[in-house]
Amino acid sequence: MERIIHGDVLSPILAYMRLKGQHKVILESIPRDKETARFSILAYNPVFEIKFENGVLYQNGQAIDRDPLDFLYEVTHKNQHHSDLPFGGGAIGFVGYDMISLYEEIGQIPEDTIGTPDLHFFVYESYMVFDHKKEKIHVIEDALYSGRSQEDLEKALNQVLEELRIPAPNEFEDLDLSPLDFKPHIAPQKFEEMVETARDLIRNGDMFQCVLSQRFSAEVTGNPFDFYRNLRVTNPSNYLYFYDFGDYQIIGASPESLVSVKNGIVTTNPIAGTRPRGATDEEDKALATDLLSDEKETAEHRMLVDLGRNDIGRISETASVQVTKYMEVELFRYVMHLTSVVKGRLLPELTAMDALKATLPAGTVSGAPKIRAMRRIYELETEKRGVYAGAIGYLSATGDMDFAIAIRTMILKNQTAYVQAGAGIVYDSIAQNEYQETINKAKSMTRIGELRP
């Protein structure tokens, strides 16, 4: 059951604040002048929960002996017809970086210092889709998973519409924020030693590239959703998200798609090569020119585009794989990156989950060759990555999906905020520069508690 209302009277943020539903999640994309930023999704009151934790898969708390990703697809996919809307009900959540250990031998997982599941999704049939191009809001109540009657659907829809009319108590209050004093979990010297170890392995022919990361944490007070509201203004990005999982929240502004499937077309978006933003347009242009002429950065990008082509090629029809955008400079709030786009047509016998398995984790957060690099990451890094560098997004009941790489992402748990950032190590990397790159990438999240113009 669907009701369409005018999109000029209600924003996704205001709708989130007014709705009383449980486990609300918001997915956005800014700036909205891009076609890819046409839609925002707000989902609430999930029908059930799927979680993989400590090696056990659970559905609503009941243990299930199944492959987690296959099970997720089976319970979510409902052969819904495709529409212009990106989401037709389904699962929203994340697959952690370390899930790959179920499918590949990559060694002993480091210590888990945060304690989030390896996979966590809620499955929704109550949601809103904001079409910013047509200025329409689709308010939807479905019975895909619950089998609710038409009477129950109408009652639920009217309840949502009534809640949307009533102002939230804190609509006009200042954001409840506090500056966060982030501390690195390892010393700069230790990270630089990790870089040199990786370079030695690369020089000896063990691998071509390895993406090493470091974690930062801070005590946090304030309203988690207000941190998201600040983030979307201070660091607009291709993938913006706020997830409330109950005992922890995830806030993110990822610039990079891991993989999407839409009407059988599978797409990935390699991003590699970084410079800080300049203070002026002229400085931006100079830095972009420098980035494009940097042999180390462009070689790294070419390597990861090739890796993306290989990943997509394994699940796509012969000769359908194309690089539709190649090594273009894209500007973000604090940094600029080299970006490319790789597309292919998914083999008819495969599903979106096959595409996710083929691409997780991205080469841009692991390295090349991918399996070898992941083994070295486990040997060099001291903490389990968890959400960081995994996949975060949705799997629609239509069989389509869209997952970002979980970078520029913050975990809030037990009054602590966690942020992680990495750098791609290659043969001629300079350890101090790679350390500084992780600092530059983390800035968008470590400054999330600061109100800035």
Predicted region positions:
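Extended alpha-helical targeting/anchoring segments
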Residues: 1-453
